[in-house]
Structures are given as C-alpha cells and as structure tokens.
Regions:
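TRNA-recognition modules of translation machinery and tRNA-sensing kinases, especially anticodon-binding
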Residues: 1-191
C-alpha cells in the first residue's frame, strides 16, 4: 500500500520507473559512497575475475546513467524500488538487506532542489507520517553529493536510526531515497 501511494504520486508527476540489477561492478561505488559504506559492501569475484558487489545503494548506479544511457536527454525523471545490501550490525531500523525507494532527475535543466524536498515530504505525509522533520542543511556522508550538502527527513519515533529519507544534488542530477523498511515502521497507513 505504501509503495502504491508513492508510485501513484510520482507517475502523476511524470516520473517513470526504472529497474537496475542488484549485482553491480564494485568500482561503481569507489569514491562515491564514502569509506564507511565501502567497508560494508558485500563484494565477490565472478568467474570472469570481475570484482562485483551487491548494491549498497542506487544513486551511484543511476548517476552513471546520466553519462551513458541518458547522456543526450534532459530532465529525465526516474524512480525505483530496489533491494540494498550492507554488512552493518542489524539493529532497530537498520538491516543488512533493506528496500530503497529512490527518486532521481537526471541532466536537469533547472534547479529542482526545493521541488525534490517538497516531493519527498509530500510522499512521506501521504504514507501516513505526520511527525517528520525536514532538515535542508545536512552534510551527507556520500561522496557524490555536491559539497556533501543535502537534506534529510527524520522521524523521532525511529529512535537512533531516525532518518527516513536523504538526498541532494550530484554531478548529472538530483535525487533522494526513502528507506521503505523504516517508513513502514512509522506509517499510519493500514492501522
């Protein structure tokens, strides 16, 4: 139900769903996801001796599409719902496998920053969370964000892992991701 609310909202706003594989080249994330996330990646070598990983997040993957598949297109509006994998200590609201719902605009022709923050907040509100806090002046731990600046939406009811959503501008685009597992913990939909 939560996913349907977000998909309906984004489809109405002109976004298209994209699917990308969970297994990625490990180098896709080098120098982009920060040293902490690099250390938590599940990596392995395949039969072709390529260094692969289970994707720890997807903005870095989508960012490469701005330079390749969508190189000649502007204002490409995409969303995705994909599984992420991180070798971190499981605790309340933090899992080794979790679902990321991401929203990206590739090769933007205008500054969508405020619009993306408003969309993220609106989606969270439509999912039955009314006690969220928007922080538009956050230093993000992911190296692909411009000046490491970004935004977060938090819910205090989640305790120490209170971030519901994070995003910002990066070379070739702007976007945010919502942790669906955390959103389900605080959503009033289905009560």
């Amino acid at each position: 139900m939560i996913t349907n609310v977000m998909v309906d909202f984004l489809t109405y706003r002109g976004f298209d769903e994209i699917y990308v594989p969970n297994i990625q080249m490990a180098e896709t994330f080098n120098g982009k996801v920060g040293p902490e996330n690099n250390n938590m990646m599940y990596t392995f070598t395949d039969r072709g001796n390529r260094n692969l990983c289970l994707a720890p997040e997807y903005t870095a993957v989508i960012q490469t599409l701005a330079d390749t598949a969508y190189k000649n297109e502007k204002d490409v509006k995409l969303f995705y719902e994909l599984e992420c994998f991180r070798g971190e200590k499981p605790q309340a609201g933090r899992y080794r496998q979790f679902t990321q719902f991401g929203v990206e605009i590739l090769n933007p022709t205008k500054d969508y920053y405020g619009e993306m923050i408003a969309d993220a907040a609106e989606m969270i509100a439509r999912c039955g969370v009314d006690d969220y806090i928007v922080d538009t002046n956050v230093v993000r731990g992911l190296d692909y964000y411009e000046d490491k600046q970004g935004f977060e939406i938090r819910c205090e009811r989640l305790g120490s892992s209170k971030q519901l959503c994070g995003g910002g501008k990066y070379e070739g685009g702007i976007g945010f991701a919502i942790g669906l597992d955390r959103l389900m913990l605080v959503s009033k939909l289905g009560e």
